[in-house]
UniProtKB/Swiss-Prot annotation:
The lineage of its organism: Bacteria, Pseudomonadati, Chlorobiota, Chlorobiia, Chlorobiales. GO terms for cellular component: cytoplasm. This is UPF0235 protein Ppha_2415. It holds the Pfam family DUF167. It comes from Pelodictyon phaeoclathratiforme (strain DSM 5477 / BU-1). Belongs to the UPF0235 family.
Amino acid sequence: MIELREKNGSAVFVVKAQPRSSKSRVCGLYNGGLKVNLKAAPVDDAANRECCELFSKLFRIPPSRVHILSGQSSRTKTVMVEGISSKAAALVLEPFG
């Protein structure tokens, strides 16, 4: 199960990113968080932007409402989805874990 927290009315969870994959997608669970494959290389913040875009499409919100709180230069990232409660996020992320 995905470990979700709530911070100021926004869902927060951990993501393990794998850059330079053949396509961008959510793969499933990884140590209480989500594992994602990202097509972009980790150069000039491209993989971080792609990670935010992936979750914005998944939650059907603008990319500006998805933030990486920590791990900008790491494969393990803490992601916040602004304006989505942890309960609503759990429903969206349920198929992945």
